[in-house]
Amino acid sequence: MGALRDVGRPPNAIGSAVVSDLSPVFGTVRVEIRRLDPDLPLPRYAHPGDAGADLVTAEDVVLAPGERATVRTGIAIALPDGYAAFIHPRSGLAARHGLTVVNAPGTVDAGYRGEIKVPLLNTDPATPVKLTRGDRIAQLVIQRVERAAFVEVDELSDSARGAGGFGSTGGHAAGAEQS
C-alpha cells in the first residue's frame, strides 16, 4: 500500500461564506440552500465562467485503494421545477489522485430536499486517499431540463447513425490484429 495522500483544500475553506461573482455570460437561477453544517462553506464557483460550483466534504474520510464511500456535503438545496443538479468529479482529483464520483454525473432532482451526498471511489490501485473536512470533492452543475412526452411507435425514423452503438465509429486500434 502506498503513502497516504491528502487532497488538500483552498485557504479559509471552513467557515468562509465567499460568494464569487457570476459571469455576465451565464444566466442565473435562484437556488435555495440549507446549510446543515454552519461551519462549512456554501458551494462556490472558483472562477468566472465556471459551470460547476465546488462541493466540500462534511467529514474526514480515508479511502483505501479501490474503496468507495458516500460522503456528506453538509448542504441541501431546493431547485425550481424544470431544473436538475448534476454532481461531477473534480478533474484535478481524478487526474492526480484517482478519485472519482461513482455514478458520474449524479443527478439531484428538483423535488429532492435531503442532504447532498457524493459517492466517491478511489481508483488508485496502491495509494489511499485522505479527505479532510472542508476539502473540495466534487462539482455541482445546475441545468435546465426538459421532460419528454414518450410516444410509442412501431418504427423509428431513419438517421445517419442508425442503430450503430458502442464503438460503431471506430477511433482506436486496441485489440486489432496486426498483419
From Swiss-Prot:
Q: Which reaction does it catalyse?
A: dUTP + H2O = dUMP + diphosphate + H(+)
Which InterPro entries does this UniProt record tie to the protein? dUTPase, dUTPase-like, dUTPase-like_sf, dUTPase_trimeric
* Entry binding sites for substrate: 90-92, 103, 107-109, 117
Family as reported in the entry's similarity comment: Belongs to the dUTPase family.
| Keywords, alphabetical | Hydrolase, Magnesium, Metal-binding, Nucleotide metabolism
Taxon lineage: Bacteria, Bacillati, Actinomycetota, Actinomycetes, Streptosporangiales
Q: Which GO terms describe its molecular function?
A: dUTP diphosphatase activity; magnesium ion binding
NCBIfam families given in the database record: dut (TIGR00576), PRK00601.1 (NF001862)
Q: Which gene encodes it?
A: dut
Q: In which pathway does it act?
A: Pyrimidine metabolism; dUMP biosynthesis; dUMP from dCTP (dUTP route): step 2/2
Name of the protein described by the UniProt record: Deoxyuridine 5'-triphosphate nucleotidohydrolase
Q: Could you tell me what this protein does?
A: This enzyme is involved in nucleotide metabolism: it produces dUMP, the immediate precursor of thymidine nucleotides and it decreases the intracellular concentration of dUTP so that uracil cannot be incorporated into DNA.
Could you tell me the EC number(s) of this protein? 3.6.1.23
Q: At the top level of its lineage, which domain of life is listed? A: Bacteria
Cofactor(s) this protein requires: Mg(2+)
Which GO BP terms apply?
dUMP biosynthetic process; dUTP catabolic process
Known Gene3D superfamilies for this protein? 2.70.40.10
